[in-house]
Amino acid sequence: MSLESLIQWDQQASLWLNKLGNATWDPFWLMLTDTRFWFPAYGIIMLFLFRELGWKKGLAVLLSIIVMLVTVDQSCNGFKAGLERLRPCYNAWMIAHDIRLPYGVTGHLFGFFSAHAANTFGFAATSFLGFQLNRPKRSYRVYGWCVFIWAALVAYSRIMMGAHFLGDVLVGACYGLAVGSAIACLTHYLIVKARL
């Protein structure tokens, strides 16, 4: 498959997914895509983190989450500036085919790859592995399901808002998972080494 064919498929799939939206659900997707909505959930998870792991391991995992978020967010900005792929809301083909923009044009000009998807999947991986690796006798399966479903919904909200193509979201999710998993495993190694 050529790059041109892949781009066309990505545009068509993204447009189809975007048009599944409607005015009834738009406020829900807007709420999910708004990072201010995430902070109460982050706070609750941090309290749970310290309760489950104690303050030393909890602090180490919290720092790993912060490092992951800064790393992923800043590198996403670098990719966007370097690759210069227009967001769907600025793409002439998408506009000509009536992309839904429920709240108008969103974000800066370039969007490859999705920082929302990368950050949320990175957070999901880092926090889930932070729990599971550092307290292996407990099962965090329910937490894992919840946090990864939340990450997927946030990523999908970016398509619904017309801010990202499906490919932007998939690459962002994979990138976040990779960086988050690597940082979580490194943190676990350091916790074991330091005998926290």
Annotate each PLM feature:
Residues 1-43, 76-109:
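N-terminal transmembrane-helix/juxtamembrane module of multi-pass inner/ER membrane proteins
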